[in-house]
Amino acid sequence: VLHHPALELDFVFSTSNAGNEIAQVHADLEGEELPRFTSELNSDVDVLFLCLGHGNSKIFLENHSFSEATHIIDLSNDFRLKEDRVLGDMEFVYGLPELNASEISKSKYLANPGCFATAIELALLPLASQGLLQDDVHVNAVTGATGAGVSLSKTTHFTWRDNNFSHYKAFTHQHLGEITESVSQVQPDWNREIYFLPNRGNFSRGIFATAYTEFTQDLEAAFELYEGFYKHAPFTFVSRREVFLKQVVNTNKCLIHLHKHKNKLLITSVIDNLLKGASGQAIENMNLMFGLERKLGLELKAYFF
């Protein structure tokens, strides 16, 4: 938001930090000219980003009203699933630009996808678009500590996270629902399972996801399919070289690599969980909603060193 040429920050709402400087909470913003946190809302803004905890966005919108012209982008999971997308007169669109760019460009209310969901959907959608998901899909994905949010917990403490590795919510992660719905949107007859194993890594930012499933064509056919599917996607790139996290951290990119072993296709998908998996994608969606250049404010270089 700070460096987006078409945006002017009107307010940052917080009841717990009202009156405090933003840099008091977000120390990386020290020295920036910013308003203080406020408990007062301006109901006439052009766009509102909701960054509340899961389950709180719906309550917030039920208790606050905004101008008919206000566009709302919600970063929680409150409106991501089809059964949850209507609240009163508001109907939310699922905001994966590589899947729903046309619908996003016409929407006023948007549900920003989850971070794991973004990485995994981008890995699978090209296959689904041609009806080529014919078997179960196995996914193993590792996320950094920032995937757990800012609240302190045992598994985000440095002494626990450092030199450590673990899985959590095996086969039951909350992002499975939106992943399955997105895949079924482009391949309606798909009725197999996604076996998703999420892992906690000992790094701060990024998601490294690998998925494999049956694929009878050769590797070149797979590359041509993926390159064609993402030909016009400004942030999703198919690499013929192996990819790694440092290529995407601090960017809105998703990098994809393919590998074939016997009758299995391995798809590697890497993103920054805080940008393409959250706030960066929210800005990308806002650009689409307002008819702006999709890359505006998002041409960022990776933190490689």
Features from the language model and the residues they span:
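N-terminal Rossmann-like NAD(P) cofactor-binding subdomain of oxidoreductases
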Residues: 1-162, 166-170, 189, 257-261, ...
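A short coil-to-beta-strand element that immediately follows conserved catalytic motifs
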Residues: 9, 135-139, 191-194, 235-239, ...
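Conserved active-site and cofactor/substrate-binding residues in soluble primary-metabolism enzymes
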Residues: 91, 115-122, 170-178, 221, ...
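Short, solvent-exposed beta-strand edge segments and adjacent coil->beta transition regions
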Residues: 107-110, 165, 206-210, 266
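Short Gly/Pro-enriched turn/cap motifs at secondary-structure boundaries
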Residues: 167-171, 199, 244-248
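C-terminal substrate-binding/catalytic lobe of Rossmann-fold NAD(P)-dependent dehydrogenases
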Residues: 172-238
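C-terminal active-site/capping subdomain that shapes the small-molecule cofactor and substrate pocket
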Residues: 209-305
